[in-house]
């Protein structure tokens, strides 16, 4: 019996249910050593056990390697952004952005999206019955939820890299007018910082509901290094994010594929 094979057997949701069902007690139920010893498991050959273990190890290795790459790269990005505040004067972004108010009147855009406070587009919580009034966010534009009340002390803003989509008519949409001065991804990295969340909340106005309006967005100040430096920082971030995504996919696959392999071994 391979210890790692046994560990993978224990990781299965089926074993969680088995252990819960076979726990005994009144105020506190326990899965005793005796219950553990009475657990029945299928025992394929050690070679078959090792095949499953090797697949699990491969996914875990991919996950750990890419996590090790992503962490320092993310730290480099953050440190660069911090340094920029001291090296370059802060400038308002107003002269370089333009508000967009294109409505989906002909229903040509069918993809409806919301925006999470994690700064990404997501499936909407609800879709308007009359989507003709929804605003269109074109590829390369920014969308944001003007309302900052009851939003986890954050502002929901995202940069659209996928296909054109629509958002609620209550949202704001804008684009950068000169990408030779501001790299869109660089601006997105800046507004994704916790410091910007605090700034947006502080500058929001209203009574029962507070809003961060477009005129306040125009007054946001950021350091503007040469475009080559902005793009270099963005490229580092993209490398870090790619490594992070690979790690997450490997982790997800290890949770999906390995139980399936184990199930195959059990029933073969």
Task: Label every PLM stretch briefly.
Residues 1-4, 24-47, 165-170, 205-231:
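A short glycine-rich beta-alpha junction/loop motif
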Residues 1-11, 139, 143-192:
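A short beta-sheet element
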Residues 11-14, 101, 148, 192, ...:
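Hydrophobic alpha-helix feature that most strongly marks membrane-spanning transmembrane helices
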Residues 15-18, 196-199:
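Periplasmic-binding protein-like
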Residues 21-23, 106-113, 202-204:
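Short coil/turn segments at secondary-structure boundaries
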Residues 38-104, 223-268:
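Non-catalytic DNA-recognition/assembly elements of restriction-modification systems
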Residues 94-130, 144, 162:
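DNA target-recognition patches
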């Amino acid at each position: 019996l391979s210890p790692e094979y046994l560990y993978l057997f224990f990781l299965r949701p089926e074993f969680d249910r088995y252990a819960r069902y076979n726990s005994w007690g009144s105020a506190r139920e326990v899965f005793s050593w005796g219950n553990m010893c009475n657990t029945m498991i299928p025992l394929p050959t050690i070679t078959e056990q090792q095949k499953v273990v090797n697949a699990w190890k491969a996914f875990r290795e991919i996950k750990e390697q890419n996590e090790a790459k992503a962490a320092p790269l993310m730290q480099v990005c953050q440190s660069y952004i911090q340094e920029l505040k001291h090296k370059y004067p802060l400038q308002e972004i107003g002269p370089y952005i333009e508000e967009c108010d294109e409505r989906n009147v002909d229903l040509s855009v069918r993809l409806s999206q919301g925006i999470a406070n994690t700064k990404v587009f997501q499936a909407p919580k609800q879709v308007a019955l009359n989507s003709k009034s929804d605003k269109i966010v074109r590829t390369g534009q920014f969308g944001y939820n003007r309302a900052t009340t009851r939003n986890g002390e954050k502002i929901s803003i995202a940069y659209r890299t996928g296909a054109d989509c629509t958002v609620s008519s209550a949202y704001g949409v804008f684009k950068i007018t000169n990408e030779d001065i501001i790299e869109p991804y660089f601006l997105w990295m800046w507004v994704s910082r916790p410091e910007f969340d605090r700034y947006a909340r502080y500058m929001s106005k209203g009574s029962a509901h507070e809003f961060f309006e477009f005129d306040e967005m125009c007054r946001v100040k950021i350091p503007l290094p040469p475009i080559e430096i902005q793009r270099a920082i963005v490229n580092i971030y993209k490398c870090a994010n790619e490594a992070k995504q690979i790690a997450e996919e490997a982790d997800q696959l290890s949770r999906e594929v390995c139980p399936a392999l184990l199930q195959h071994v059990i029933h073969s």
